[in-house]
């Protein structure tokens, strides 16, 4: 395969994954057809199987890559001179109006979690792996000794729940209250600096 063809194939594969991620957020896995994914990527349906073995293969990879990219991007935005400050900057970014309203590039979890639970394997394993990886990285950032992992898990649950509820009632006062409550509870969850 020539370099040009290899690059074109790589670009097509990326476009398919971007389209699938957008559909995952908007409709979920079950309601997203291969035809819809390919249409969103600006490609013909016939080319799909040059890139992925099945719809399941595509969405498993989207869950892995999309979750990883989202979490890694969030962790890279961490700012502050202390572990607490960096962790709070992550929670504030995640629970921001901008992130809530960014349906096409935000976190995959609110749109995917319930469906992944119903769909079972291999989706569940893919998501579990990515969540575990984020928890490990977040726990290292929190740096709260023996409680680091527990706090990272608690914060992830809090962040996801607040964002999910906020998105469900977006455009209302209650939506903003969910984000604010998530931020306040995050502050309480993290160890105070000495």
Predicted feature locations:
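Helix-turn-helix
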Residues: 15, 23-57, 61
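N-terminal positioning helix adjacent to the helix-turn-helix/winged-helix DNA-binding module
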Residues: 5, 12-19
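Hydrophobic/aromatic-rich alpha-helical bundle segments in the mid-to-C-terminal region
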Residues: 120-129, 141-194
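Amphipathic alpha-helical segments used for helix-helix packing
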Residues: 86-89, 100-128
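N-terminal intrinsically disordered/low-complexity leader segments
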Residues: 1-9, 192-194
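Hydrophobic alpha-helical connector segments
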Residues: 61, 75-106, 144, 155
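Short, basic, alpha-helical segments at the C-terminal edge of helix-turn-helix-like DNA-binding modules
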Residues: 64-70
């Amino acid at each position: 395969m020539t370099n040009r063809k290899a690059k074109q194939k790589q670009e097509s594969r990326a476009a398919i994954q971007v389209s699938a991620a957008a559909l995952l957020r908007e409709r979920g896995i079950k309601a997203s057809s291969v035809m819809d994914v390919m249409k969103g990527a600006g490609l013909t349906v016939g080319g799909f199987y040059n890139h992925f073995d099945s719809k399941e293969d595509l969405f498993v990879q989207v869950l892995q890559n999309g979750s990883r990219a989202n979490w890694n991007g969030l962790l890279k935005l961490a700012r502050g001179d202390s572990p607490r400050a960096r962790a709070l900057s992550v929670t504030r970014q995640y629970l921001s109006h901008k992130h809530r309203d960014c349906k096409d590039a935000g976190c995959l979890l609110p749109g995917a979690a319930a469906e992944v639970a119903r769909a079972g394997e291999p989706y569940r394993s893919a998501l579990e792996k990515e969540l575990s990886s984020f928890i490990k990285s977040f726990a290292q950032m929190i740096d709260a000794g023996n409680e680091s992992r527990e706090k990272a898990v608690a914060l992830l649950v809090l962040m996801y729940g607040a964002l999910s509820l906020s998105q469900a009632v977006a455009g209302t006062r209650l939506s903003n209250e969910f984000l604010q409550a998530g931020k306040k509870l995050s502050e309480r969850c993290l160890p105070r600096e000495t």
